[in-house]
Amino acid sequence: LIAAIIDLIKEFKSKHEIAGIGISVAALILKDQGTIAGAPNIANLSQLNFVSEISKVFNLPVIAENDANAAMWAEFKFGNAHGLNPVIFFIIGTGMGGGLVIDGKLFRGASGIGAEFGHMIVERDGVLCGCGSHGCIEQYASGSALMRYAKEEMKADPIKAKELLKYSDASGDISGATLTTAAKQGNEIALSAFNKQADWLGNACASYTLLLDPQAIVIGGGVVDAGELFLTPVRSAMEKYMPFAGTHTSPKIIAAKFGNEAGLIGAADLVRG
């Protein structure tokens, strides 16, 4: 993997002037901004150090940052989180990553793995997570959870399953995009799956609000394509589960500005210092 990254950098360097190298990766990154402590959703990354290996080849500043932290930074500096303090970011994909900015700085914690919101345990002895624990919110509010909810309902009701499959691709498989399209057309299974996912995420937002009192919670990743169809039930669920409801101002829940390139934008800005 590192060799492939080095080859890619060489290709860019042959065509462009490069001032630094910022890498966004879906993994826990230690505070040295180089060593990978763990990667629940990507095999064989643990203990790799991108920075030390790449620095041997290029005489340039190099940093590696958790993808959600990098995306959080992009939204804070240039996107829909600009000027907000504190602000939380969730990236909802295969897993569920998190980032946090307090007083204009990324919060990394003592060793660098802080704000890993996707691994808050919400269900004791719940679904096994890639991190090795059980019942992490990632297993209930991620894109993978969305797919699981849909498939469970398809299995329980074959007639409704056929209706959903009308929105599938040529292979007959369903995807997050399939569910988004179907939900926008009012498909029962797709809407139910999104509502279950939103309920869990709203529950988590309520807990994080009491912990950090953010001005806003920004949501990125593929679920943003569903728009208010997803965000509205997240807000409703947050209010439903909010402790001390009515005694404080709830955070805004808003969609991220940037899509899949958010991590790249954030990493590029972070390496500039």
Mark where each language-model region is:
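General beta-strand structural signal in soluble alpha/beta enzymes
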Residues: 62-66
